[in-house]
Swiss-Prot record:
Record InterPro entries: PLAC_motif_containing (IPR006461)
Highest taxon above the source species: Eukaryota
Bilayer topology term: Single-pass membrane protein
A Pfam family of this chain: PLAC8
Family statement: Belongs to the cornifelin family.
Function: May be involved in cadmium resistance.
UniProt keyword list: Membrane, Transmembrane, Transmembrane helix
Source taxonomy: Eukaryota, Viridiplantae, Streptophyta, Embryophyta, Tracheophyta
Parts of the chain that traverse the membrane: 59-78
This protein's record includes keyword Hydrolase: no
Source organism (scientific name): Arabidopsis thaliana
UniProt protein name: Protein PLANT CADMIUM RESISTANCE 9
């Protein structure tokens, strides 16, 4: 196990967040800075993982930008936080998902990124890479014909 893997290991307890909402500066400063500077890209990465590759990170990022332009980006992002919570049976804490994304979106995105990473899914790698390229364009295996 590499030193980096050891750093990312965190005891995962079902039904509990592995880190707090405001742990962004104490644990993963690079992700924290990234979500403050490029929240739409950070959101796109998280959405791609939560949608299991069905939604591309680019499309999700553009959707949150479009929704933000009419003041509803926080609502769109909060739906993905709810999806993450339901997937891992996490509590809606410290307050409602919408309120967290409305008032502290970068902290919410950083926490969601850390949560996925601690559970073995790194949003920065993307869905196909993380899952061994399951959706890559590999030609199907064709059995050879019968020989006489």
């Amino acid at each position: 196990m590499s030193e980096q893997e050891g750093k990312n290991e965190k005891k995962v307890t079902e039904g509990q967040w592995t880190t707090g909402l405001y742990d962004c500066l104490s644990e993963d400063i690079s992700t924290c800075c990234f979500t403050w500077v490029c929240p739409c890209v950070a959101f796109g990465r998280i959405a791609e993982i939560l949608d299991k590759g069905e939604t591309s990170r680019g499309l999700a990022g553009l959707m949150v930008v479009a929704m933000s332009s009419i003041g509803c980006g926080w609502y769109y992002a909060s739906k993905y936080r709810a999806k993450l919570r339901h997937q891992y049976a996490l509590p809606e804490a410290p307050c409602a998902d919408g309120a967290i994304h409305c008032f502290c979106c970068p902290c919410a995105l950083t926490q969601e990124h850390r949560e996925l990473k601690h559970r073995g899914l790194d949003p920065s790698l993307g869905w196909n890479i993380e899952n061994g390229g399951l959706n890559s364009n590999t030609p199907p295996f064709v059995a050879s014909g019968m020989d006489r």
